[in-house]
Swiss-Prot record:
Residues that coordinate or bind Mg(2+): 282, 284
Protein known as: Phosphoribosylamine--glycine ligase
GO biological process, alphabetically ordered: 'de novo' IMP biosynthetic process; purine nucleobase biosynthetic process
SMART domains, sorted: GARS_A, GARS_C
First and last residue of the signal peptide: none
Keyword RNA-binding carried by entry: no
Organism: Rhizobium meliloti (strain 1021)
Glycosyltransferase keyword on record: no
Length: 423
């Protein structure tokens, strides 16, 4: 099978690494890729925002299957264009991608289908939003409705912080994504991510993970796209997984189909495990980044036929086998991230990969014959172990072998799980 992978981040490097292991693969292409992905795939100079160029490439190179990694091309309708050209594609339609592309769309779906989530209101003007916030009080959550690269959410602990977040959205900080704001109740509990594949009708549960959104140790500082993750998340017990499937995932699949937007691809449910049980914070319509990296390290099964089954309506009866171990990834980022940061700083050395350790490339590039940091989140140093604590020790040992003066990272990825393991 000839496969084209769309994307250039750490998530796509993890997908490329796993797809490249498939005995069904004959050739893997990637666009735009990165130096890490180049170790697994042929990098293609393809402007993926020009959908017809992607179709032309697929026809010219007899591509059998396209895997779309990031959310933006999905929301822009790349999957629709490819499917219209009879090219099987992993990822939802633009209409179904509204689950991630519009927070308001998802909250309305939850309300219609009784899916547990925080109470909310939608606003297109600052003053009514602020009036509602005054009524509800803090803490409260302010979300830009559209895609904001993981940075459009403010958990406001005071009214002033909430008002500032509303003003930031409506002042254009997130462009069109902030033209509408969702204000929702603050949920108290422990966050977890849960992943499933869906072919429009059937659902295959994958695994859980826990992300670390805040930039600083102790979950301090501003939100980021994610500074680390581990899998599985201990809070996602067998009972919690069963409840998540019955109360959240299955009603969503039914609701999307009944609304005329059958969902194919990966469901990434951002959950808060509260005293009441699992509640939905948000949906994403692609693998998480950096959660994908820990999932791929743990996945025993061949990924390619699972993705193809989700894309072609043949998921029923499929199974995913998982290694009975934990995986943890530490994100190394450019100093200053998530604010302004210096680009093209040299990365002098990376640790050697082993069976238990892998460095996935995110914002990297080759310049002057050397590896440089070209983005905010740059490397995902990932390891496995019998426990989260063991995986954490292995990952941080590898982090110390990275020679990159301009990089920084959190020192406490996995702290909740390690505390549970050592209690």
């Amino acid at each position: 099978m000839k496969v084209l992978l769309i994307g250039s981040g750490g998530r796509e490097h993890a997908l490329a690494w796993k797809i490249a292991q498939s005995p069904r693969l004959t050739k893997l292409y990637a666009a735009p890729g990165n130096p890490g992905i180049a170790e697994e795939a042929a990098i293609v100079d393809l402007h993926t925002e020009n959908h017809e160029d992607v179709v032309d490439f697929c026809r010219t190179h007899a591509i059998d299957f396209v895997v779309v990694g990031p959310e933006a091309p999905l929301v822009a309708g790349l999957g629709d264009v490819l499917r219209a050209a009879d090219i099987p594609t992993f990822g939802p339609s633009a209409a179904a991608a509204q689950l991630e592309g519009s927070k308001g769309f998802t909250k309305d779906l939850c309300a219609r289908y009784g899916i547990p989530t925080g109470a909310y209101r939608r606003f297109t003007d600052a003053e009514p939003a602020k009036a509602y916030i005054r009524e509800e009080g803090a803490p409260i959550v302010i979300k830009a409705d559209g895609l904001a690269a993981g940075k459009g959410v403010t958990v406001a602990m005071s009214l002033d912080e909430a008002f500032a977040a509303v003003d930031e959205c409506f002042a254009g900080a997130f462009g069109a994504a902030g033209a509408e704001v969702v204000v929702e109740a603050y949920l108290d509990g422990e966050e977890a991510s849960f992943f499933c594949l869906c072919d429009g009708k059937s659902v295959l549960p994958l695994a859980s993970a826990q992300d670390h959104k805040r930039v600083g140790d102790g979950d301090t500082g501003p939100n980021t796209g994610g500074m680390g993750a581990y899998s599985p998340a201990p809070v996602m017990t067998a009972e919690m997984v069963e409840r998540t499937m019955k109360e959240i995932i299955e009603p969503t699949v039914r609701g999307m189909a009944e609304s005329g937007y059958p969902f194919t691809g990966v469901f990434f449910a951002g959950l808060m495990i509260t005293e009441k049980g699992p509640e939905l914070i948000e949906y994403n319509v692609r693998f998480g980044d950096p959660e994908c990296q820990v999932l791929m390290m743990r996945l025993e099964s061949d990924l390619l036929p699972l993705l193809y089954a989700a894309a072609t309506g043949t998921l029923e009866g499929m199974k995913a086998e998982w290694r009975d171990e934990a995986a943890l990834t530490v994100v190394m980022a450019s100093r200053g991230y998530p604010g302004a940061y210096e680009k093209d700083t040299p990365i002098a050395a990376l640790p050697d990969a082993s069976a238990a350790t892998k460095v996935f490339h995110a914002g990297t590039a080759m310049k002057g014959g050397g590896l440089v940091a070209a983005g905010g989140r740059v490397l995902n140093v990932t390891a496995t172990g019998k426990t989260v604590g063991e995986a954490k020790d292995a990952a941080y040992a590898a982090v110390r072998d990275v020679s990159w003066e301009n990089g920084f990272y959190r020192n406490d990825i996995g702290w909740r799980a390690v505390a549970r393991e050592t209690a």
